[in-house]
A protein has these predicted regions:
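Early extracytoplasmic/lumenal segment of secretory-pathway proteins
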Residues: 40-105, 356
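Short beta-strand->loop
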Residues: 47-50, 131, 147-149, 155, ...
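A structural signal for short loop-to-beta-strand junctions that line the ligand-binding cleft
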Residues: 90-95, 113-145, 161, 171-174
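Short helix-loop capping/hinge motifs at secondary-structure junctions, enriched
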Residues: 150-158, 190-199, 283-289
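Periplasmic-binding protein-like
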Residues: 170-177, 295-316
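Ligand-binding pocket segment of bilobal, Venus flytrap-like solute-binding proteins
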Residues: 188, 193-261
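An extracytoplasmic/periplasmic, membrane-proximal ligand-sensing/linker region
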Residues: 198, 310-356
Length: 356
């Protein structure tokens, strides 16, 4: 090493003495680039909408296995706008987010690169990834019905369309329709039944509400527990989070008050949504970003998703956790999830018209 440095200094002195500035700059650039590549820190920068407690264990395991450090910027909103503003100067290598609509926004703004990875295409079914392989689902959640154990027979509702039945008038609670989760649900109904029937369904659903849409999914379970309503729409993982919530033990009682109903089991299957990720086209650490994305689709990470977060694995070779399995097997709607994003604007117009 010392001999190499001495040689470099000798050559630099020779170049400078000849006052050949161009050669000096070219040579210096080559040498600097060489040593920078050899000693560059092995890292990957992640911009994430996902809560730190949900994803940091995955990153820690990835670093143990690969030696690649994961730097994370967590945010509740604004990541799309940030990457757009930063452009080619962004530090982001990998985007992680929930809901297909958010993933698609990055594609629509030409911020994600097409990924050529046999690992990803083998691990993730085609309906759970972008048609051009610009994003890949990393976990699934089913949007199910939560029904009162005391007041609603679990087999009295078969399909999501049944919520439009007037017999449920004053019995249903939901969060606002414009939330990503409900908008995607409505998009799935548009895909299945057409826009006109979907709007009729949404209008009748609003007529059946026990109260104005408010709160998050857990707030709907609380409302059932308190007798405000009998039926709610919620993502499956919230049931697990309430059931085992030691920090807020009152939520355990909310979970005890409800049964989960998977809908549309005799036809298209229960609507699902995803959390996923994609590599930023400006990424400075593309190989590391792809490696992390691949890691998140492998069996160990997929098992961890199911165990920690109460989410369903997207890799078909990985079984749901024991807890998830105890909720029952279900048939899922295998509509390509990117179709949900395509129909989201139409769904939002319906939501606005019916006042959901």
């Amino acid at each position: 090493m010392l001999g190499s440095i001495t040689l470099i200094i000798s050559i630099l002195e020779s170049v400078v003495m000849k006052k050949n500035l161009v050669k000096f700059l070219v040579f210096f650039g080559l040498i600097f680039g060489f040593y920078e590549s050899v000693y560059a820190k092995s890292e990957v920068n992640v911009y994430s909408y996902r809560q730190p407690i949900l994803i940091n264990p995955f990153f820690e395991e990835f670093t143990k296995l690969t030696g690649i450090e994961v730097n994370v910027l967590h945010a509740k909103k604004g990541l799309l706008e940030r990457v757009l503003a930063e452009g080619n100067n962004t530090q982001a290598d990998l985007i992680l987010t929930v809901d297909i609509a958010r993933l698609s926004q990055f594609v629509q703004n030409d911020l994600l690169m097409e990924i050529n990875s046999n690992t990803l295409t083998q691990n993730i079914p085609s309906y759970l990834r972008d048609s051009n392989n610009k994003w890949f689902a990393l976990s699934k959640r089913a949007r199910v019905l939560a029904v009162s154990k005391e007041r609603v027979a679990q087999d009295s509702i078969k399909n999501i369309e049944d919520l439009a039945d007037s017999k449920w008038k004053g019995k249903i609670c939901t969060r606002p329709g414009s939330h990503d989760y409900n908008r995607s649900l409505l998009a799935s109904i548009i895909a299945a039944n057409g826009e006109a029937k979907a709007e009729e369904w949404a209008s009748n659903l609003v007529a059946n509400l026990a109260r104005k849409p408010e709160g998050n999914d857990r707030a709907q379970a609380k409302a059932i527990h308190e007798g405000v309503c009998d039926i709610a729409v919620m993502n499956t993982y919230y049931f697990g989070k309430m059931k085992f919530n030691e920090k807020n033990p009152e939520q355990k009682e909310w979970a005890k008050s409800i049964n989960i109903v998977f809908t549309n089991q005799d036809n298209r299957g229960n609507h699902i949504n995803v959390a996923g990720g994609g590599v930023v086209k400006y990424a400075k650490n593309k190989a590391n970003a792809i490696a992390l994305l691949e890691f998140l689709t492998q069996s160990d990470a997929q098992t961890l998703y199911a165990t920690m977060n109460y989410e369903y694995p997207v890799n078909p070779s990985v079984s749901p956790s024991k807890e998830l399995s105890s909720w029952g097997e279900f048939k899922e709607d295998k509509l390509p999830v990117e179709r949900l994003a395509e129909l989201a604007p139409t769904a939002q117009k319906i939501i606005d018209r019916v006042g959901w």
